[in-house]
Amino acid sequence: KVVKGKHHPADFVLWRTAKPGDLQQWDSPWGRGNPGWHIECSAMVRSLLGTEIDIHTGGEDLAQIHHNNETAQSEAANGRTFVHYWLHSAFLTMSGEKVSKSLGNVVYLSDVIEKGFHPLALRYFYLQAHYRTPLSFSWGALAGASEALNRLWKLSRDIAHESKCKSTSSEARNRFLAAIRDDLATPQALGHLWETLRSEDYAPEEKWGLLEDADAHFGLSLTTPPT
């Protein structure tokens, strides 16, 4: 069934006619009303970032409808490419359910800190999975990430004592950067980091150079570990 006023079944709402009691409504050439869901996002992007942006993120559930519609209306209005790179992330789950405000199962950073974890442990936890791969959160999994990060920090301190300067080029650095450039393959990049730091085939200077590169991309305080 095609809604009255549509020219095509795939048409989506750009402007909604106001209903009695609507808290948000404005005058427009099409009558008093409020913008459609997709228009809200296009308007915010244009107002704050401009008509063309490099990276747009969002959940995987927004890819097929919302972001396609957002692109269609933005490019029609502005006459230029809307987004150069889309990053659609898979869901974070907990006990088999998607983490969401509507379900009331959200974990806040303050909760993480109250349980004694360093905030960067949560970042490390996220980096262990590719952004397009579902990730299951538990306090046990976060504890494992925290232990791994603490081991990385210890390795960093040990290497800092041995290293005299940074090596600007190495095969290890190239492997790490290749993983990052491959659709942000952070699990593989972390794997290369661990492999290099544990190996005896690389000089301390090469390891320190890789730690600096990893820190620039991950922000894990690898070269300035907390004491």
Regions found by a protein language model. Give the residues of each.
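Alpha-helical recognition segments enriched in aromatics with Gly/Pro capping
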Residues: 1-158
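Structural preference for alpha-helix termini/caps and helix-kink/transition segments
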Residues: 98-100, 105-227
